[in-house]
Amino acid sequence: MAGFRLLVGLGNPGSEYENTRHNAGAQWIEALARQSQCSLRSEKKFFGQFGKVYIAGEECYLLIPTTYMNLSGKAVQAVCQFYKIPPEEVLVIHDELDIPPGTAKLKQGGGHGGHNGLKDIISKLANNREFGRLRIGIGHPGHASQVANYVLKKAAPDDYTKIEQAIDESLRYVDDIVRGNLNAVMNQLHSFKA
C-alpha cells in the first residue's frame, strides 16, 4: 500500500485542554515533532499547527488542527487540497474510548465510531473513509452519558503514564507507518500493552 504523507493529531486548542484524554492525537504529533526536530508553526491557511519533516526518506506533513475537535475536517481538507494528498495518504492519530490506556491500534479506513473529529474529517473528505487511523487508547468511563466529560478531563496519573507509553511505543514504528507497512506494524504494536 502507499504510505502516508499527512499525519494529523487531533485535539482541542487552548491550555485548558492540554494533556486531556481527547488530546492524545495532538500529543503524538508533538512528540514526533520533537523526535524529528521539526518546528510546528501556526499556519492560518491550514487552520492549525503545521510542519514539514522527512521520515524514512519521504517528505511528510505534520498537522494539529487548532479548530475545535468537531471541526477538524476543515484543517485536513485545506492541507489535502493544497498539497493534492488523497485520503488514503492521510493518517489521523486520535484518542480511542474502546481500547484501554497503554494500547494503540492502527488501521486503514473505517467509520467514525462516534468520534466527532473523525466524523467531520469524513464529511470534509467527501465521505471518503479510507484514511488511516492510529487509535491511542484512553479507556471508557463505563456509561455513554459520561463520555463527553471524561474525554475533556486529564487522565489519572497511572492512566496518563500508560497513554504516554503507548504514544512512545507507536512512535518506534513511524518509519514503517509512513512507508505504509501497516501489517508489519500491526503485528508488533497490537500486542503491546503498557
UniProtKB/Swiss-Prot annotation:
Gene Ontology CC: cytoplasm
Catalytic activity: an N-acyl-L-alpha-aminoacyl-tRNA + H2O = an N-acyl-L-amino acid + a tRNA + H(+)
Residue(s) at site: Stabilizes the basic form of H active site to accept a proton: D95
EC number: 3.1.1.29
Keywords (A to Z) from UniProt: Cytoplasm, Hydrolase, RNA-binding, tRNA-binding
Subcellular location: Cytoplasm
Family annotation (PROSITE patterns): PEPT_TRNA_HYDROL_2
Residues the record lists as binding tRNA: Y17, Y68, N70, N116
Enzyme type, top EC level: hydrolase
Keyword RNA-binding (UniProt): yes
Site features described as Discriminates between blocked and unblocked aminoacyl-tRNA, chain residue numbers: N12
GO MF term list: peptidyl-tRNA hydrolase activity; tRNA binding
Principal subcellular localization: cytoplasm
Gene Ontology annotations of biological process type: protein quality control for misfolded or incompletely synthesized proteins; rescue of stalled ribosome
Residues forming the catalytic site: H22
Annotated transmembrane regions: none
Function according to Swiss-Prot or TrEMBL: Hydrolyzes ribosome-free peptidyl-tRNAs (with 1 or more amino acids incorporated), which drop off the ribosome during protein synthesis, or as a result of ribosome stalling. Catalyzes the release of premature peptidyl moieties from peptidyl-tRNA molecules trapped in stalled 50S ribosomal subunits, and thus maintains levels of free tRNAs and 50S ribosomes.
Record note on quaternary structure: Monomer.
Protein family per UniProt: Belongs to the PTH family.
Protein name: Peptidyl-tRNA hydrolase
Underlying gene: pth
